[in-house]
Each structure stands twice: as structure tokens, then as C-alpha cells.
């Protein structure tokens, strides 16, 4: 099974992420950031990734450190679980609509971290959640999962819908990229022979 557990403790946050890339979308969260948990649930359910995440952070200041560090820890767990990447599809993409909103996510498990994030939210907050923190989450993830990730919200009026289409598409793109390719069994999907940058 491709699974991993990572604990990351700093003076600002204490976070544990357990994931199973070959799961069924089961999820349990205790982060103190409800809207983020709603988005993480989209990753689990649409990516068929089992996620168990606990986080304690300096939420008396704001959610910035918790959200960013959660992205970092999730990226570390993902990198550990995916291993040497032999026999996987490597690339993943998805378009996901929700009513008026439409987002596209494309990723490459390349070993080279990079984020292209093109989202213009129609509001600065969703409930009490600062939408700027989504970018921090994805930056943390790509820098520690060592993936290239392109996120484009193509249209949307409702900020909740914009965010939800992004996270659903991210989950589906991950599912595609990590899926074993029976024609590539035991083979690294790169002409370089490695996907470690």
C-alpha cells in the first residue's frame, strides 16, 4: 500500500497527516479551520485518497500558519507515499464545474516543484476564511511533494463554488497521476530514468 504518516511540529503549529493513495476517500479532520476541512474532504473523496489530519495552530492570530503548514505536511506525506514513482501515469488533469464555476487543474509528478495559480475570487473571504490562504496551501504542497501544479479558475461568481471546483479538480488530477499504468509496470515514466528533479 502506498501510504505514509508525517508529523511536523514547529513553534506555530503541530500537524499530523496520514494518507493512503490507494484508499476509498475516507477522511477525518481536526484542524480548527472548518472551511479548509470542507476543501480537504474534496481531495479525499474525488482523489480516492484516505486522509486523517490533525492540526493545532496559532489560530488566535489567524489561520495562515495552520493552512500553510498543513500544505507542507500533506506534501511531505504525499512524497513519502508515492515513493520512486515507478509504474504510475505521472500526469493528471481535470476540469470540474459547479453551477456557474469551472476550474482546471493539471499536474506533473515531475520532481520539480512549481505552482501556477490563477484564481480571481469574487470575495476576499468565504465565511471567515481568507481566500489568499489557498495559494499558501498549494505553495506548501508543491514545494514538499515536488510536483508541478497548474490551477486555473476559468469562471465563477460564487467564491465557495470557485474554491470547491479547484479542490475537486485537484483531487481528480491527483487520482489520475498516481494511478498505476499496467503498460509501465516497474518503469519510471521519464526519458531521464528518474523523477527526482
From Swiss-Prot:
The Enzyme Commission number assigned here is 4.2.1.19
Q: How would you classify this enzyme at the top EC level?
A: lyase
SS bond list: none
**GO CC list:** cytoplasm
**Any one GO molecular-function label of the UniProt entry:** imidazoleglycerol-phosphate dehydratase activity
Q: What is its main location?
A: cytoplasm
Task: Write out the entry's keywords from A to Z.
Answer: Amino-acid biosynthesis, Cytoplasm, Histidine biosynthesis, Lyase
Q: Where in the cell is it found?
A: Cytoplasm
Q: Which domain of life is it from?
A: Bacteria
Please tell me whether the keyword Cytoplasm is annotated for this protein.
yes
- Tell me the GO BP annotations in alphabetical order: L-histidine biosynthetic process
Q: Which reaction does it catalyse?
A: D-erythro-1-(imidazol-4-yl)glycerol 3-phosphate = 3-(imidazol-4-yl)-2-oxopropyl phosphate + H2O
List the Gene3D superfamilies hit by this protein, alphabetically. Answer: Imidazole glycerol phosphate dehydratase, domain 1 (3.30.230.40)
| Pathway the protein contributes to | Amino-acid biosynthesis; L-histidine biosynthesis; L-histidine from 5-phospho-alpha-D-ribose 1-diphosphate: step 6/9
Q: Which PANTHER family match?
A: IMIDAZOLEGLYCEROL-PHOSPHATE DEHYDRATASE, IMIDAZOLEGLYCEROL-PHOSPHATE DEHYDRATASE HIS7
Similarity comment text for this entry: Belongs to the imidazoleglycerol-phosphate dehydratase family.
What is the protein name given in its UniProt record? Imidazoleglycerol-phosphate dehydratase
Amino acid at each position: 500500500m502506498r501510504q505514509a504518516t508525517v508529523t511536523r511540529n514547529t513553534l506555530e503549529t503541530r500537524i499530523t497527516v496520514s494518507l493512503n493513495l490507494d484508499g476509498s476517500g475516507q477522511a477525518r479532520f481536526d484542524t480548527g479551520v472548518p472551511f479548509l476541512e470542507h476543501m480537504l474532504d474534496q481531495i479525499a473523496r474525488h482523489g480516492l485518497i484516505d486522509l486523517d489530519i490533525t492540526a493545532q495552530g496559532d489560530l488566535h492570530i489567524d489561520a495562515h500558519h495552520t493552512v500553510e503548514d498543513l500544505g507542507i505536511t500533506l506534501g511531505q506525506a504525499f512524497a513519502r507515499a508515492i515513493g520512486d514513482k515507478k509504474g504510475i501515469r505521472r500526469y493528471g488533469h481535470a476540469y470540474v464545474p459547479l453551477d456557474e464555476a469551472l476550474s482546471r487543474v493539471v499536474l506533473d509528478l515531475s520532481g520539480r516543484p512549481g505552482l501556477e495559480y490563477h484564481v480571481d475570487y469574487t470575495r476576499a473571504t468565504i465565511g471567515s476564511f481568507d481566500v489568499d490562504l489557498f495559494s499558501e496551501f498549494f505553495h506548501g504542497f508543491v514545494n514538499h511533494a515536488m510536483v508541478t501544479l497548474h490551477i486555473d479558475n476559468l469562471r465563477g461568481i460564487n467564491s465557495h463554488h470557485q474554491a470547491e471546483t479547484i479542490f475537486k479538480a485537484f483531487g481528480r488530477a491527483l487520482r489520475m497521476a498516481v494511478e498505476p499504468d499496467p503498460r509501465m509496470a516497474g518503469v519510471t515514466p521519464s526519458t531521464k530514468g528518474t523523477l527526482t528533479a
